[in-house]
Amino acid sequence: ALYAYMPRIIRYYLDEDPILPNVETHLCREPEGLQYTLDHLHELVVKPVGEAGGYGITVGPHASAEELEACRQKVLDRPHDWISQPMIDLSVAPTLVDTGIEPRHVDLRTFAVTGRDTWVLPGGLSRVALRKGSLIVNSSQGGGSKDTWVLEDDRPT
């Protein structure tokens, strides 16, 4: 649930606006967040706030009617335990699987380091959904990872 507050946290502690927009996050413990989530359940990704690693997530656009109803009941029973977000399209990358090379959904985690100076590391961690069609990239849910490096070409152009 902390994610919903990140823009406010940045403004409070850094006295500046966030550079990158935050993914819209609805807190089901707030009446307007709960109502929006219930009204748009089939369009949203609904996540438990106390879980990690992709557990307990309902991906509305990919869920059956029964799964959506089960999710609705869980949210209604304990709204303070849930958030929802719009479904974000993940890019795909060629991935080596048992049958050859196939496209799989990926996301990229980049890292910044601060001290006397601040810099962004020249690479990151790409997480990949190894199951065909899956949007869940978490390793605990069968996802994999790849080091990602940004290389500079010193050859003249």
Question: Residues of each region from the PLM?
Answer:
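Domain-scale recognition of functional cores that engage charged ligands
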Residues: 1-157
